[in-house]
Structure formats: structure tokens, C-alpha cells
UniProtKB/Swiss-Prot annotation:
The cleavage peptide sequence for the hMPV F protein (RQSR) varies from the one described for other pneumoviruses, and differs from the furin protease motif (R/K-X-R/K-R). The chain crosses the membrane at residues 492-512. It is found in: Virion membrane; Host cell membrane. It comes from Human metapneumovirus (strain CAN97-83). This is Fusion glycoprotein F0. The gene is F. It is a single-pass type I membrane protein; Single-pass membrane protein. Gene3D superfamilies: 1.10.287.2480. Belongs to the paramyxoviruses fusion glycoprotein family. GO terms for cellular component: host cell plasma membrane; membrane; viral envelope; virion membrane. One of its GO terms (biological process) is fusion of virus membrane with host plasma membrane. Disulfide bonds join 28-407, 60-182, 283-311, 292-301, 326-335, 350-361, 384-390. Its main location: virion.
Amino acid sequence: MSWKVVIIFSLLITPQHGLKESYLEESCSTITEGYLSVLRTGWYTNVFTLEVGDVENLTCSDGPSLIKTELDLTKSALRELKTVSADQLAREEQIENPRQSRFVLGAIALGVATAAAVTAGVAIAKTIRLESEVTAIKNALKTTNEAVSTLGNGVRVLATAVRELKDFVSKNLTRAINKNKCDIDDLKMAVSFSQFNRRFLNVVRQFSDNAGITPAISLDLMTDAELARAVSNMPTSAGQIKLMLENRAMVRRKGFGILIGVYGSSVIYMVQLPIFGVIDTPCWIVKAAPSCSGKKGNYACLLREDQGWYCQNAGSTVYYPNEKDCETRGDHVFCDTAAGINVAEQSKECNINISTTNYPCKVSTGRHPISMVALSPLGALVACYKGVSCSIGSNRVGIIKQLNKGCSYITNQDADTVTIDNTVYQLSKVEGEQHVIKGRPVSSSFDPIKFPEDQFNVALDQVFENIENSQALVDQSNRILSSAEKGNTGFIIVIILIAVLGSSMILVSIFIIIKKTKKPTGAPPELSGVTNNGFIPHS
């Protein structure tokens, strides 16, 4: 009873880390803080020898029976696994070739294991396949079912022998078949064979279905008791071991298995378990949706591109851009350090005032609004724009209200669901504090008509700079055009003046010519012949 009191007391004195989510109105994003890290820092290798027994020399020639069916399954599985092993060796050669590894790994269901982790695991598997290493592991397991063995390259591995099927075959099945052949009336014997054979057949199926590399650690590859012993042997602190034992399902999901090969009547494979060497440092997650401002049918849209998980590790801030690199269990976040990127401490400024920070906060821009929902740990961001119907609802009463166009933040206390057209999103029921940080949407700082074409993952200050440069070019073009128009006006005036002067000169010339050729009205008519001097004009 005393140990229960101790546990209850420890729970009472342990500080509770509540979650706090802030909605940043300026950038249509949320930051959720209060998580604690569980970061993978290494791998722990466990080598299994699953011993089948001398089934190849057992034969059933006395007709169909349950024993014969199970025996045929076992022999067929061994042959299949040998084929898988041969194919896997060829595939691993490609994995170690940098030019081909990404294509080969893309065809394997890696689950949450990274390509780098699998490549490292394959290197260890190649070492274990050496005849001297296989012999050393078998020798270490001659008198025990579990032993720590050191490979030739100095890597220490935990070796585990699984002998239940072999013991049943040698001590029970072989004796019964030799005595009564396969037509055994004892149904219990057939059922026992099936039970002992189940783990072996499931291991074969998993390696066969996944090309020799499993995406996680099943109970057949490693029982719960075997997992607990392996975790307890890990070179890490008691607190970290305790946390991993409490989250064995996560350890299984983050691990993977690699087939070593078939050696006689033994199947050898290795299991890579994650070592979570960093725990309880602060972590937070950033989520975002498009923020758009419209004008006369044109839009200026921005979306934060620094979304993902962030964790403190050894004084640095590690960013996990792929949300799948981290998984939560309660307020703990399990992440793979190999997938993280170190970023400056100033990156947090993007969560305060994205438009005035000196840090290059990354965004994507566009001129076409996209309606979407981004679920956050304590609510949802809803980007609702033209031509789309958006609403929030309750599981009990249905739709509560329609949402306005633009970016909205819905807490999981305000609603149970968010609906965009015919798609319904269920909000989480995680408890925590929610806050709204008011601010003018940064997208409204831009003129939608002059907003540039789509840009991906650029610094926000670069967007401002590009628009300023574009505006400067527009202003310069206007000045040049204005000057050209003024020059053209003067040129036209000169042409008109020249034309007027030219026309005037022509008219004057014509007038002079006409003037000269014109005679007075009273002059005598010009006559041909002799002049009459006696003619006296009237006065």
C-alpha cells in the first residue's frame, strides 16, 4: 500500500505543464507552447535468433492432416524467407549507393524511420552477416537466452535467442511423428504446433511484405517482455528509461526491423530501437493558414512557411519542418533529432510581430485565395474566401453559425466541428489556455492590384522590397511617360507653327502673284493692229 501512496504523492508534487495557444491575428497563425521534448539521440540494436528446429527432415506421407498442413507452412515460410533475404542483399547494395538509395528507400514502407537511420541500420546488418559475427552471436547464446555481444567494429548489441518453436519441434513434435506418423488423433498436439509456429510465420510474413525492412516493431518481432529488457539495458538515465517504458507503443512506432538472413534452421534479424536521450526541454508548434486581402476582385495572400515543431536542445533551437517527424503523447513530443534543423533563437520573433522583426520570417505569396482549415492542438484556423461556405458546429445541435470571409480562429471550446463546403473537421478536446494577439493582417499592407506573382518560401522583408522596387519602376515609367508626353506636345506645337507659317507664306505668295497680274478697271482694252492716237479716254 505504501508504494501507492508514494506514487500519488509524487503526482501531486509534480508540476503540471499546461498548454497555451496564442492566435496571431496579424499572420493568421497559432503557436502552441507547453510541450516537453523526448528527442531521439541514438539507436539500440537487438539481434534475434529465431530457431525453428529440424523441420526440413520431418515428412508426412500418410495423407492429409493438421500436422502436415502446419509442417508444410513452416517449410514454405523458410524457403520464402531465403528468397526475401537474397533479394534484400541486392536491394541493400542499391541503398548504400547514394545515387540510387532514394529510389530504393522510396519503395520501402519506412514508417517513421528516416532514410539515414535505415542506411545506418543496413551497415550494421552487413557486419552481423559476416560468418565470424554470426558464430560469435550463436556462441554467446549457447548457455543463455540473452547476452550482450560486441561486434568486430566495436558496436555492442543485445542478442536474444527465441527457442520455443525449436524446443517444441525437437522434444514433442518429432517424437510424436516418429511414433505415430502425422495422422495424430491428439488435437492438442496440432493446436500446440500452430501456437508455437505463429510467431515464426508472422515474422516471415512481415519481412516478406516489407522487402526485408519492417516499418515498426510488432509484438511478433519483439515481445513486450523482450522490449522492456532491451530498454532497461540502454545506456541512458533512469528517468529516460522510465519514460520509454511508459511509452512503449511510441518506441515500437519509431523503431524498425531488418532481416539478417536464414542460417540453417535459424532466422536471424535485428531490431533497431530509438534511444530518447533528451527529455523535458521546451517544445512548441506553429500552425498557419492563408491570410488574404482583396480589392476589386484582386487578392494579396500570404502564408507562413515556418510551420512545424520547435524544441530546445543543448541551448539551441531545433526546427522540424515535417510535422510527421514528431508525435505527441499527452504533453510530450517525440522527435527524431536527425530530422531537425538548427535555427536562430531570433526565429521566435516571427511569433510576436512578423511584419516588423529583423529576422527573415519565411512566407509564400499568391494572388489566388485558398480556403482551408489548419487544425491546431487547441482549435482551428479557418481561411474562408470567395465562393466557399464556412461554418462551425456542435456535435449535439449541428451548425452554430456561418463564418465571415477571411481568417478566423475557432477554439475547441467554441465548437466541436468546422465545415468548409461539404468537408467536416473535428476539433480536438485537449485542454489548455487560448489567447488572441490582435494585429492588422500583414496582407492588408499590400495593394492587391500591384501584388507580385506567386513566390514560395521567401523572406517577408524580401516581399516588401520586391513590391517597393516594383512601385519604384512603375513611378519611373510614369515619369518617363510624362516627360515623353510633354516632349511630344512641344514637338506637335512646333510642327503646327511651322505648318501655319508655311501655309501663311504660301498664301502671301499667291496673293502677291495675283496682285501683280491684276490690271486697273478703266484701262483701255488692248487691241491688235495699229494704235489709234486720236482716242481720248473719258475723264
